[in-house]
Every structure is written in C-alpha cells, then in structure tokens.
C-alpha cells in the first residue's frame, strides 16, 4: 500500500519541483549585492561626495609612481629641459628622456598620460554626479565642485603643455559613449576649458588657504595667473592682453598676502 501511494505522489512532486525550480533559482541568483557600489548607485549621500573628491586628490600622487629602476614618472617634466642629469645607466627609458629620443612607448610618458586622464575621469564623475546629491549642504557641494574643476584644469594644463592637442573629455565615459575614442582637440579649446574651470573654482567659496592641503583660493588665482602667462606666449601668442591678465591675477594674491601675513606668508 505504501509503495502504491509513493508511486502516485512522486510524479506530482517531481512536476512541482520542475515547475517551481527555475523561477526560484532565477529569483535567488538575481539578488543585488547591497555592498556593490557603481557610479549609478554610489552618489547618494554627502559622504559619497567627499569620498569622490578624495579619490581625485589621491590620483594626483600617481605622478610620483615608479618608472623603472631608480626613476619616477615626474622626471618626464624635468629631464627633457636640459637642466638636470643622471648617472643611472640601468634605466633605458630614463636615458632616452635625457637624450631626447623618447616616444609614446617610454614608461614615463605612458605613466604621465594615464595619470592625467585618471584625474580627469574622476573629476568628470564628481562634476556629473555630485550636483544630484540631495539633501546636501549647498556650500559644501559648491566647494567640492570647485575643487574638482581646479583639479581637472590642473591635469589638462599639464597635458596640453606636454603634448599640444589632446583629447578633450568633459563627461563620464562608458563603452556606449559616442566619444569613447575621442580625437585630439585643438590647444585653443583645451585652454578655454582650463580657464573656464579655474574661473568657476575661483567663485566656489574656497578659503584663501587650507591647512589640510585642499585646493585654496590662493592656489586657484595663482594657477590662473600662470595659465594666462602661458597663453600670452607660444603657441597661442595671445600677447599683451594676456600678460596683463596674468599680472593682475598675480597681484590679487600678492595684495591679499601683504594684507593678511598670518594667512599667506609669501616672504617669511
């Protein structure tokens, strides 16, 4: 009797398992891990904004990454000038820098290029995502966006002076982005973004000095003076008008420093 009942019930149970099994497994496997963060679900609270801008600052350190034995990436900015020398015979990339025979395969060039566009990419994320975080103190939000603008302009200023025309990327990129493989933009356009970013940072309510090492108003104004000075000469040749812009902006820093020696002491 027991055997007969089992034979009748077993097919019914099997059918139920087959019907319910796929649905149950699918629901189980589709669970969203709550600890996984992506650009789409990360920027939701003010702490995320602070963490995001911190990541941009962190990427600035990559300019000091190693570039082979006894060498760092920053030497790309010094070796080709002819104002320094080295006795490191073991590093062919570094020797090529000093011999002015380096190219896109030289480790220092690769590192500095990647570093510049990591900073730009992270800053673009901050500028695109942080404005949508609510609730958030508007003054803090404005400060963070100003810092991101400065850091992006800093990276582009280095890139345009090193390589001339460079890709001009101002939005977060995905594989679906239309400009995922961007072409090089004219230097004039790159400098326009640099100036626009610095002017926006200048109006972001930054403190004149920040002991924590964050971007300060003094840094923004000083960098803007430097950019104007560069634009006045080669290759843009903006001339006297930009020399005056540079002088006026630098004078703002000097004037404030003289009036507030306890804040900015340029000549201790």
What kind of region is each of these model predictions?
Residues 1-34:
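Bacterial Sec-dependent N-terminal signal peptides
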Residues 25-75, 101, 243-246, 267-268:
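Membrane-proximal, proline-rich intrinsically disordered regions
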Residues 32, 160-171:
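Short, well-structured active-site flanking segments
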Residues 40, 67-88, 169-171, 206-219, ...:
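Short, surface-exposed recognition loops and adjoining beta-strand edges that mediate ligand/DNA contacts
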Residues 50, 58-64, 88-163, 179-192, ...:
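Conserved, well-structured interaction surfaces
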């Amino acid at each position: 009797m027991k055997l007969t009942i089992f034979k009748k019930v077993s097919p019914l149970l099997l059918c139920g398992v087959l019907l319910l099994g796929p649905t149950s497994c699918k629901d189980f496997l589709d669970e969203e891990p709550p600890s996984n963060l992506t650009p789409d679900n990360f920027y939701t609270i003010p702490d995320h904004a602070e963490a995001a801008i911190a990541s941009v600052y962190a990427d600035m350190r990559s300019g000091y990454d190693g570039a082979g034995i006894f060498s760092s990436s920053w030497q790309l900015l010094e070796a080709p000038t002819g104002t320094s020398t080295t006795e490191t015979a073991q590093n062919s990339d570094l020797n090529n820098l000093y011999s002015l025979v380096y190219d896109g395969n030289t480790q220092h060039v690769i590192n500095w290029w990647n570093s510049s566009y990591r900073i730009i990419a992270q800053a673009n994320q901050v500028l695109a995502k942080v404005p949508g975080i609510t609730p958030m103190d508007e003054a803090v939000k404005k400060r963070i966006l100003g810092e991101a603008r400065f850091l992006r302009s800093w990276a582009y200023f280095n890139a345009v002076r090193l390589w001339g025309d460079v890709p001009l990327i101002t939005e977060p990129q995905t594989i679906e982005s239309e400009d995922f493989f961007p072409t090089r933009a004219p230097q004039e356009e790159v400098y326009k973004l640099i100036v626009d970013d610095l002017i926006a940072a200048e109006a972001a309510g930054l403190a004149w000095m920040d002991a924590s090492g964050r971007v300060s108003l003094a840094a923004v104004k000083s960098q803007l003076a430097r950019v104007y000075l560069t634009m006045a000469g080669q290759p843009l040749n903006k001339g006297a008008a930009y020399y005056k812009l540079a002088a006026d902006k630098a004078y703002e820093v000097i004037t404030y420093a003289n009036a507030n020696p306890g804040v900015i002491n340029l000549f201790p």
